[in-house]
Amino acid sequence: MPRCPSPSHAIIDLSAIAANLAVVRKRAGDRKVLFAVKADAYGHGAVEVSRYVEKHRYADWLAVATVAEGQELVEAGITLPILKLSPADPWDMDAAITSGIRLTVVDFDTLEAVSKAAVRLGITAKIHIAVDSGMGRIGLRPECLAELTAAADRAKGVEVEGVFTHLPISDVPEGAEFTRREIDTFMTAVSLIETHRGPFPLVHLANSGAILGHDLGKTSMVRAGIVGYGYDPNPHADRADLHPALSWISHVTFVKTVSVGDTIGYGRTWTASETTKIATVPVGYADGLSRGLSNKGHVLIRGSVHPIVGRICMDQFMVDLGPDSNVTVGDEVVLIGTQEDETLTADDMAELLGTISYEITCAISKRVDRYWVGQ
């Protein structure tokens, strides 16, 4: 039996991703480009995006957060090297090593566990050592890097392929001085080791914010995340050279007229102040539309911006069309994207919710069909 399409769908413009990664390539110079495709490529579809990026050589590496994410890519035939950015876990270490996924080593215990697993499997595990230069999340401090690197060089079954850190405030102007000091501290630690050890094959620290706004120094790879999907990590930056790749589209399923005093939705949180028309749209928080946008968010219908009214339900929400609307059942509804001369972005949603564009696109659920264009 043919599968019915979902009530809403996301359209991913792969040519936009290509254009965004061209911006990254230009900033990276001769450095390698790692493209983060974790969280299903930030909601854009990891397998399809990775295939496209590999086919056209828009990136040299891919990054994931879990071994399962990496395995999905390997099983789909992706051959680009894949780095698991989060710490190597004992329970999926064997699967990672067998699949050729590069592992992140954060301390001596992790190193020992990777070494034992690699020796037992008879496979060399390639690792990247994480340094905590200010993020406070994973890795040892820069002053411990030399000792951990020496231990890794001695460990059986392990090949040190890279060393990296992560910059927590590279995306805003007020973080420039801290980021500069952080980069200097990390690179000094790396340089001291390389003077007697020899160079690390890969040294990387630049996330999207650093790629767009900082000196990349003597690094050999950059890590593009949200920038590849068309958003600056600083939502207040004016980046005309970035193109959001994802649009989210639905349609009107019902239109009715309400009178003054009529209420809409659970909790009766919205009351009509005039006779107006209300449209129902078959998208809800189960699809990834945050309930926090109730009585806050907006959509595009027939080229005009209309407010979401009442509480967003699990599977539906309502829109105030105004008293003179000629919107009908079946009309296109744009949640993210462009319609005629109007555009709504993930940044617009994020600002209303006090969050970031990353969370908006990652939250769009599997219930929403994806379609890829621009190949």
Swiss-Prot record:
Write down any Gene Ontology CC term: cytosol
Which Gene Ontology MF annotations are present?
A: alanine racemase activity; pyridoxal phosphate binding
The superkingdom listed in its UniProt entry is Bacteria
- PTM N6-(pyridoxal phosphate)lysine: list the residues: 38
Under catalytic activity, the entry for this protein gives: L-alanine = D-alanine
Gene Ontology biological process terms in this record: D-alanine biosynthetic process
Name this polypeptide is given: Alanine racemase
